[in-house]
Amino acid sequence: MTVKIGINGFGRIGRNFLRAAMEQSADIEIVAVNDLTDNKTLAHLLKYDSVGGRLAADVSFDADSITVDGKAIKVFEERDPANLPWGDLGVDIVIESTGRFTKAVDAKKHIDGGAKKVIISAPGTDVDGTFVMGVNDGDYDNETMHIISNASCTTNCLAPLAQVFNDNFGIERGFMMTAHAYTADQNLQDGPHGDLHRARAAALNIVPASTGAAKAIGLVLPELQGKLSGSSYRVPIPTGSIVDLTIITPTDGLTVETINAAYEKAAAEGALVGYLKYNTDAIVSTDIVHDDHSSIFDAGQTNVSGNLVKVSAWYDNEWGYSNRLVDLAELVGDKL
């Protein structure tokens, strides 16, 4: 069954979701978009992307819609999701990608408007479930879960990294650090901002930032609840990020080779195939841009000092995450 999708918020993630659905040839029909920007701008930003390049499709617009390769996508400009006619359009799932309606009570407005399900493209509050594909997507229950979260891009990278290590060797405690590409909530030039770190020029500075990825790990891996904490630094690149996970393990005598072998196996067989990638090349952030894996394990960065271990994984924080949104939407749609 083709799943009918409405996108609320046609920014970086909303547009990349559409691109990813096209590239995957997913069994998805995007029937409507809601965004406060005019259609000319929305069409232009979909067609031309500074990171992803030009979309390999014909894109046009009129007063009511954007057309992609002959398929018209209805466009609305509503501030309140309660005013969106999802039911009239036959929308099955809303991708909530504004970043504003992350609480279940707010996202429920899409359900009230006729949508069957909502997937929030960010950590959610009081949602029915939080999912990382390949890690806990088997826990999705169509009967009881209607407003769910795709977690964060960093949690999507961290969860496979932590799961493989914990399953093979055990984690007593851990600390995650992510060097994360800058995002639109930072200033291009120094200027006022509610967060004084993010007030500084994004393209000129390494900027300390908050992250809830480590604390959120317990939502998808309950066995690690309370065992991880973390920090984040925004770095002056537009996309391409890395997670370093430092672990205290109860297992003695581990070697780099033993640890790497566990990740190589997990990437080649089992639930993480297609989500976890094993890499032995000497890569940098540019090399993983437009890689659709959630977590790209870098074997060359593994370090061991007794029971203290560091493992690392790269992720394209936009493209990889948007592909997981498509995967989760297909999973939810298949169970409708």
What are these regions (language model features)?
Residues 170-232, 238:
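Catalytic core of tubulin tyrosine ligase-like
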Residues 230, 242, 246-336:
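C-terminal active-site/capping subdomain that shapes the small-molecule cofactor and substrate pocket
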Residues 66, 131-133, 147, 189, ...:
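Short clusters of hydrophobic/aromatic residues that line enzyme substrate/ligand-binding pockets
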Residues 22-26, 163-171, 181-184, 211, ...:
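Generic secondary-structure signature for well-ordered alpha-helical cores
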Residues 1-199, 303, 327, 335:
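N-terminal Rossmann-like NAD(P) cofactor-binding subdomain of oxidoreductases
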Residues 3, 26, 172, 231-233, ...:
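Structural beta-strand/beta-sheet cores of well-ordered domains, especially the beta-sheet scaffolds
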Residues 144-145, 201-203, 240-244, 308-310:
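Short, solvent-exposed beta-strand edge segments and adjacent coil->beta transition regions
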Residues 8, 12, 40, 89, ...:
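Conserved active-site and cofactor/substrate-binding residues in soluble primary-metabolism enzymes
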